[in-house]
Amino acid sequence: MIERTLDHRFLPGYVAFPGGAVDDEDAPLAGRWFGDPREAARAAAVRELAEEVALAVTADAVVAAPVEGPLAPVHEAPPPRERLAEVARWIAPTQVPVRFDARYFAVRMDGAADPTPDGAEAARAWWISPRSLLSAWAAEDVLLYWPTHFTVTALAACRDADELFGLRIETREPDEDELGRFPRSVFFQDR
């Protein structure tokens, strides 16, 4: 997980999964890595992980990405498309000030390198279990935005990695009960 920098344009100080917008470069990367430029969102996930926390998803592992050329390990051993399982997609409701269409991917890994925050978008980066993150949120130690909260809640319910990789989270907008039950910070950026 990352904690966004306090000067981040959207949800500063919130804890989130590494990620960001699909850039123009992602379709060509998707063509190169996955054989299909329509997989630009999947390529963006790989690129953002390397840029924000210096982790490169390769064919066999998740490795430390070099500061200079963080995608070099990916170019050398591209991951197959199925290595990154799409588990959720969240689209911002119209009332959200910053529009997003966020796709969440999971990747299997054994003994991955430690994440290193880039300092520009990620102030902090660390490995944490979904249940521990929800406990930190309940203790008001971290801020979670609703797509992250809903995704982490679904991940915490998985019994094992196989169940997690078969997961397809129902994407929806928060209902009235949730709007009233959760702290305001889950739904609205007040900072």
Kindly give the residue locations of the regions a language model identified.
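Nudix hydrolase/Nudix homology domain
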Residues: 15, 24, 28, 66-191
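Conserved Nudix-box catalytic region and its N-terminal flanking loop in Nudix hydrolases
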Residues: 1-72, 131-135, 139-143
